[in-house]
Curated annotation (Swiss-Prot):
InterPro entries: HtpX_protease, Pept_M48_protease_HtpX, Peptidase_M48. Pfam families: Peptidase_M48. It comes from the Archaea. The keyword Cell membrane applies. This is Protease HtpX homolog. GO terms for cellular component: plasma membrane. Gene3D superfamilies: Metalloproteases ('zincins'), catalytic domain. It is found in: Cell membrane. The chain crosses the membrane at residues 8-28, 46-66, 76-96, 185-205, 221-241. It comes from Pyrobaculum islandicum (strain DSM 4184 / JCM 9189 / GEO3). Belongs to the peptidase M48B family. Binds 1 zinc ion per subunit. One of its GO terms (molecular function) is zinc ion binding.
Length: 347
């Protein structure tokens, strides 16, 4: 029978979380400020991806090679089984999530929306068919699907009421961009790496501490590397979030190509305006388990088709402040930065 409270796992999680908070509050903003504007979008994505992969590979190398004697004696099979379990659970989630989304959000086909999605997909050169569905909820849109279910673009009925045709095409273009860029599969791949490091680290520490001779060099080294793996797993998670934000910029380029930069900006600005005019609805989206898929993960408004946005309001939003700390822990960049990015975009 498994214990309700695991002090080893809790202590390691707390340590990793504290280190992550310190890095996010003290170090990450300074690093972001120092490298801002030094890389193109493609360069930033490539650099972040390389950092994620190399950091993960290095820590696994430490456990596999540096602590090999201890692992050979105390549990190679268990640790490899743990990695397999983490990967398997993520694959099951990836396969099941489209079915869950269809049920959870009441996804239903819409012929008019399908025509728009088909037109935008053709404009962007999509080589595959994308199913269009309308779902319930606050104004939002998201892309999902896999090799079993096919590809979907979901738009809430309130988003249809909020946007005009060009703005809707920009939003749909953003979501089709996620499909073209294979972001669902890519984020699944990168998202599993912190989990592998975390469970690998916890398992290593547990094996070291449960050894009958846990004071020898091998087991002490295994425990030290295990603690390092847990801490690094939280830092890699910050890199994965940064990579996700970069992919959102990348999807915005598809939205701009589909309907123009101005339409993309007006659509984002309308969502932003809803956010500030309806703070009471924040919990609806911020607590949603699928919020990472949304075009705007923090949108929290109920649709009002009579809300409009002017160019002067967009310029004001571009200059508005935002929490750097909140951005670091978010899957999506803040709207002011996305609007400024679109200004600089050459299409």
């Amino acid at each position: 029978m498994f214990p309700i409270f695991d002090p080893i796992a809790f202590g390691l999680y707390l340590l990793g979380y504290i280190v992550m908070i310190i890095v996010a509050v003290v170090i990450a903003p300074k690093v972001a400020s120092s490298i801002s504007g030094r890389f193109t979008l493609y360069g930033a994505m490539a650099l972040t991806a390389v950092l994620i992969v190399l950091t993960t590979a290095f820590v696994i190398y430490l456990i596999a090679i540096v602590a090999a004697p201890a692992l050979a004696e105390y549990g190679w099979g268990f640790i490899l089984g743990m990695i397999f379990f983490v990967v398997l659970m993520n694959l099951i989630t990836y396969i099941a999530s489209p079915f869950l989304i269809n049920v959870t959000y009441g996804a239903r086909p819409d012929p008019r929306l399908q025509e728009i999605v088909d037109a935008v997909a053709s404009r962007l050169g999509a080589p595959f068919r994308i199913k269009a569905v309308v779902v319930d909820g606050p104004p939002n849109a998201f892309a999902y699907g896999n090799f079993l279910t096919g590809r979907y673009v979901a738009v809430t009925s309130s988003m249809l009421a909020l946007t005009d045709k060009r703005e809707l095409e920009a939003v749909i273009g953003h979501e089709i961009g996620h499909h073209l860029h294979r972001d669902n599969a890519l984020m699944l791949l990168f998202g599993v790496l912190p989990s592998i490091l975390y469970y690998l680290g916890v398992s290593s520490v547990r094996i070291a501490l449960s050894s009958s001779n846990n004071r020898n060099n091998n087991t002490m080294l295994l425990a030290a590397v295990g603690i390092l793996a847990v801490v690094v797993s939280f830092l890699v998670q910050l890199l994965v979030l940064a990579f996700s934000r970069l992919r959102e910029y990348y999807a915005d380029t598809a939205g701009a190509k589909a309907a123009g930069k101005e339409a993309m900006q007006f659509a984002l600005a309308k969502i932003h305006k809803f956010y500030f005019s309806n703070p009471e609805a924040h919990e609806i989206i911020s607590g949603d388990k699928f919020r990472a898929l949304f075009i705007y993960a923090l949108v929290n408004a109920v649709a009002n088709p009579f809300i409009t946005v002017t160019r002067s309001e967009i310029e004001e939003i571009k200059r508005s402040s935002y929490s750097v700390i909140q951005e670091i822990f978010s899957t999506h960049p803040p709207i002011p930065k996305r609007l400024r990015f679109l200004d600089q975009l050459q299409i």
